[in-house]
Amino acid sequence: MTRSVWKGPFVDGYMLNKADASRASGRNEIIKIWSRRSTILPQFVGLTFGVYNGRKFLPVQVTENMVGHKFGEFSPTRTFNGHAADKKAKRG
């Protein structure tokens, strides 16, 4: 079920403050965030966020196509190493 339209997008408050401070400084440094649940807003376009995936911060450069999505969509938490090989087929 999607979020109600009347509620609006969810963004943690500290992220707005960090984004405004980064824009004011003019330096394009990585903004570390832990909030994977926050929605990407149009004012974040052009900024680089370090999204925490449980182990490390993955850099995410925000583009216009990402607006409306969540930060967690661009920082995978699991690594897929492939399925186990069939041992009987290898012995031949």
Curated annotation (Swiss-Prot):
GO MF terms, alphabetically ordered: rRNA binding; structural constituent of ribosome
Gene Ontology CC annotation, any one: small ribosomal subunit
Signal peptide positions (record): none
GO biological process, one term: translation
Keywords assigned by UniProt, alphabetized: Ribonucleoprotein, Ribosomal protein, RNA-binding, rRNA-binding
InterPro entries to which the protein is assigned, alphabetical: Ribosomal_uS19, Ribosomal_uS19_bac-type, Ribosomal_uS19_CS, Ribosomal_uS19_SF
Disulfide bonds: none
Pfam families, A to Z: Ribosomal_S19
HAMAP family associated with the record: Ribosomal_uS19
Similarity comment text for this entry: Belongs to the universal ribosomal protein uS19 family.
Biological role: Protein S19 forms a complex with S13 that binds strongly to the 16S ribosomal RNA.
Name the UniProt record assigns to this protein: Small ribosomal subunit protein uS19
Gene: rpsS
